[in-house]
Amino acid sequence: MRVLVLGYGMQGRAVVHDLVTDPNIASVVCADTEVDRAKSGLASLGSAKAEARAIDAADPTALADLLAGGFDVVVDTLPLRFVRPVAEAAIAAGVHAVNTNYDDAIRDLDGPARAAGVAILPEMGLDPGIDLLMGAEAVRRFDSITHLRSYGSGIPAPGDDNNPLRYRISWTWAGVLDSYTRPARVVHNGEVVEIPGDNVFDEEHGHTVEVDPFGLLEAAPNGDAAKYADRFGIADTAVEVGRYTLRYPGHAAMWRQLTALGFLGKEPIPELGGVTPRDFMVEHLGPRLQYDADQRDAVILRVEAEGIGGPAGGLTLDLVDFRDLESGLFAMNRTVGFAAGIAARMIVSDTIFGRGILSPIRDVPWQPFVTALERRGISIVESPAGPAEIP
């Protein structure tokens, strides 16, 4: 099996780290604009399977030429703007593709992908990704669903949350700030509730949950849960559906005030040379929120479900992972990158056999995927408890 990994950033590094240990993988080519960085990183792995190449993904010809190199599958860890160009190039080259971004930009490519016999699997990271598999499994356990909540988080491990924000960066800081002003939708009492981006941290939209070993965490709406009610096939029966971000206590109150003061605004300030408040926050806070080499991040996924004809009292699925200090891989890297790499193998081996634009909800088999995660030290724990009531 020959695998192409696009991007050697935080997630691409984890994909390559995982792939080179697999005896069924003949070679891994990692392509990045910063090829020297990729070469240095690959050299540290000490694997003859891994090779670095330079690529400008914004150049359609260069992308097409690279994908024509005889690969079985490409794992795309590039920024969101490259999702469609990579998918189109993969279809043209007859190469399967996996990415970790939302699928909105490529849904219309289902027909061309099917015609080419190509599987394109988006949303295959952590959130979205593993959370969607957990949600699909929870839904399968009931005849009909009345309540479904999904929680996702990347926060410092207990003890390493020792700065004023109780937060550090294991993803892109710009992406985190953008998510803090992204409109959300939830289903509450059977009705779709629209939440403007400036109000996602308002008290009326949040609640708290207890997660071991973190204690009480705040939950704020994250993205479009109503959309996923449709995709899970529960829109006609569910009275409560939500997707939430978890943070340590105090986070919501602080960001609620900063948002109200305009610190996440995207309008340039002429007196400051056209810098936007959001850009200032990215550049000023980013360097101050990094992890030290001996500090750990943590990833949390929780899915809570309740319904008819399933486990009495409801069902909760939990995933908690921490940074591996030996490899240096953050929990965020591990869960996003390993999930994408596992799915890439499953497509080539026909464990995932669909073609076209696929979905983790519909097309990724639960037990083989969970088993593969467990081999990497990542477990999903089931407990017999459903969602608590939200006022």
Language model features: what each stretch is:
Residues 33-37, 104:
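Helix N-cap at the beta1-alpha1 junction of Rossmann-like dinucleotide-binding domains, i.e.
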